Amino acid sequence: MELSHIIVLALVQGISEFLPISSSAHLVLVPKLLGWADQGLAFDVAVHVGTLAAILFYFKDRLAGLVRDFFASIARREKVGDSTLVWSVGFATVPVGLFGLAFNDAIEQYARSGLVIAAMTIIFGIALYFADKKSGLKTEYEMTIKLALIVGLAQAIALIPGVSRSGVTMTAALMLGFSHSASANFSFLLSIPVIVLAGGLEAVKLLKTPDALPWSDLAIGAAVSGLSAYLCVRLFMALIARASMLPFVIYRMILGVFLFVMFL
């Protein structure tokens, strides 16, 4: 890959991974607009490593506390600190894992068209608009197992390209009365096991290919996606604490219409 391609695609992945705007829509749009070939599986793994590193670094202090509370709760067989939040993230991850195993092949075959991505971008942009009006004051620490499973079921829908994993999980949390910040925080924490699972599956496929890997290209892609993702999360959290989701809704509408025009 050319250096310019690496930087642009890694930036697109890093910026769109955690915003409620659908990274898959952008990764379809940009190469088509610019006439670039598919970036390949190795690059996908690299940028996932970058975005995972970004969110781990952003939450490093909180994650240390959550892990400590989680293992303490197991040892004592009772709730310790914020251990319930860890269980909530775990239970919310189950649906996407099960749905992925059951329907991934069908989704790959039938749902990766430009028109499907365009439709999902618009439909779930509208859902985000209405969910935004339902936001409440609940914090992520009030996430029960039942509510986490509801968010997890919503996340499973994001296996369909164009839905946006972060967008649909924030939408579900907002509909359940969580605040903007809490919805985003839970969505981002939930991204950690999902990125690990998705990246792990891609890595397994990659190990089965005999091709030599362009390590320097992959390192650049991981670094650019990681840095851009980290900065994007920081800016988004600062913005969402005092603003609505409307800018992202409008952006999704425009993007969806543009995708329809391109693929019709």
Regions found by a protein language model. Give the residues of each.
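Multi-pass membrane proteins that catalyze or facilitate reactions on polyprenyl-/lipid-phosphate substrates
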Residues: M1-L264
